[in-house]
Amino acid sequence: MRRQIMVDTQIRPSDVTKFPVIDAFLSIPREKFVPDGKREAAYIGENFQIGQSRVILDPRTLAKLLEALDVQKDELVLDIGTGLGYSSAVISLIAEVVIAVEDDSSLASEAEEILSEIGADNVVVQLGKLEDGAPEHGPYDIIILQGGVEEIPGSILKQLKNGGR
């Protein structure tokens, strides 16, 4: 019920119309990716702080990003700075495979546990430096950076397929 309300009040009014994106948000239990003390507020339209430098993006922003990227079922996606894995979980229902890179070992471990619990078996969580990405799994159709950067590192851009986004 709360997921439906989130979609109806935050995502659809933001001109997100692609069924795979909407269906993914309806299917993934956001509350599992929110810190214990904040689970009651999991579906409000805010970012959640999950570490010193990590947030779980608010549903509207993530949905608009995925709508703009036009993720396809046969695509390989690199999700850099996955945190607890919510974005990777949502993307996993739209793309073929998601490689989720996280540099915080406790967040990476918890993400693996949650993703396994919900059956997101097409997500691989990799512990490593964010600026390195995961070149061994690329090239990628789509690369998503969770957070702001002044300049995208060349090492990341080299992992993008020709024509990728």
In which residue ranges do the predicted regions lie?
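Conserved nucleotide-cofactor-binding alpha/beta core module
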Residues: 70-165
